[in-house]
Amino acid sequence: MTAIVDIIGREILDSRGNPTVEVDVVLEDGAVGRAAVPSGASTGAHEAVELRDGDKGRYGGKGVQKAVEAINGELFDALGGMDAESQVQIDEVMIALDGTPNKARLGANAILGISLAVAKAAAESYDMPLYRYVGGTSARMLPVPMMNIINGGMHADNPIDFQEFMIMPVGADSFSEALRCGAEIFHTLKSELKKAGHNTNVGDEGGFAPNLPSADAALDFVMAAITKAGYKPGEDVMLALDCAATEFFKDGAYVYGGENKTRSVSEQAKYLADLAARYPIVSIEDGMSEDDMDGWKELTDIVGSKCQLVGDDLFVTNVTRLADGIKNGRANSILIKVNQIGTLTETLAAVEMAHKAGYTAVMSHRSGETEDSTIADLAVATNCGQIKTGSLARADRTSKYNQLLRIEQELGSQALYAGKAALKALR
């Protein structure tokens, strides 16, 4: 019934107009699972490898025909006839077939596309939603959204060094109310930026990308928008940052090009602690560079008891790197990006390890996305309590929010919104 009879890979476009991989997995009973693979702009050096063609005469070298050929050829040859219910074994076969530590030969984009499509096909075969198939009967928690409403860094053409300024509607009673809160703040922010003479073009993740001089300026606009929209900062809505500090870490220091300032490792830790003291910031992602291990420890020691410190480039959804961070007291949370590691099995293992160690986990999109909403289901399946999937604009972002609305409606009275319980500092 659930034997794999066909695997079809194709090249499609992501939200930035770059090629990416889409995969259909067809089962013996006619069930079909489809998955499209995202792509990042600020990528960690330790991520699994995204296979690109390198032919400059086609899509500027970013084509994914090699990955598609691997899907339709070598990978299908190995997986054809296997049972789609055997997710772990299927993922293990692909990892072994690739034979490299970072999936560089066949490509994490090829392997992930199949891995996710297999799970979706199996869920379809059982006539179950994906969150229920992956998460079982306990999957019922709707995540607090981290809504990226001001973009900077690698996600926008403006002087702001930090990559994302986010709102978290922790005070809402339901996911649908949280989404409404975020949307109202988003539109209020647009009006406030316009009034102040700033452009309201949006960045890669749907947030605004105004020419603001500093993080303080961006945070002040967000605070004003929250209040003007009728909500209380620090009570109804909290703030979160993604510094993406690896991008401006040079020669052992943090170089703020937009502010024309350089901060030492200790100054960076103190600066972030100061921001968290002056604003209702409850989560800071990648506040230190991916290889600045001393900096991560210092930051965790200073603010880790009061603030969620999320490792993205630091951990790259990799259990080996996460285990090292847990052992050495670096960060207290992990960002979960399926394409950083390349299989569903390894993704779920990272969430499980984090939860067992008392770390939180945040399910996340990438800046180059598609209409695929798999991560919405995975957020509920893992009961991780937080999701980061962009702003309240662009269909590649709202597709995930809309899927969460559907899931909440389907769960009915069983649905539970994570709210303040998602963040240890607010419990």
From Swiss-Prot:
GO terms for biological process, alphabetical: glycolytic process
Leading EC class: lyase
One Pfam family hit: Enolase_N
Subcellular locations according to the entry: Cytoplasm; Secreted; Cell surface
Active-site residues annotated for this sequence: 205 (proton donor), 337 (proton acceptor)
Keyword Coiled coil: no
SUPFAM superfamilies: Enolase C-terminal domain-like, Enolase N-terminal domain-like
Cofactor binding mode and count: Binds a second Mg(2+) ion via substrate during catalysis.
Domain of life: Bacteria
InterPro entries for this protein: Enolase (IPR000941), Enolase-like_C_sf (IPR036849), Enolase-like_N (IPR029017), Enolase_C (IPR020810), Enolase_CS (IPR020809), Enolase_N (IPR020811)
Cellular component GO terms, alphabetical: cell surface; extracellular region; phosphopyruvate hydratase complex
EC number(s) recorded for this UniProt protein: 4.2.1.11
Needed cofactors: Mg(2+)
The reaction(s) this protein catalyses: (2R)-2-phosphoglycerate = phosphoenolpyruvate + H2O
Keyword Lyase assigned: yes
Keywords annotated in UniProt: Cytoplasm, Glycolysis, Lyase, Magnesium, Metal-binding, Secreted
Annotated positions binding (2R)-2-phosphoglycerate: 163, 337, 366-367, 388
GO terms of molecular function: magnesium ion binding; phosphopyruvate hydratase activity
Major location (coarse): cytoplasm
The protein's annotated pathway: Carbohydrate degradation; glycolysis; pyruvate from D-glyceraldehyde 3-phosphate: step 4/5
Residues annotated to bind Mg(2+): 242, 285, 312
Main function: Catalyzes the reversible conversion of 2-phosphoglycerate (2-PG) into phosphoenolpyruvate (PEP). It is essential for the degradation of carbohydrates via glycolysis.
Family: Belongs to the enolase family.
This protein's name: Enolase
Organism: Rhodopseudomonas palustris (strain BisA53)
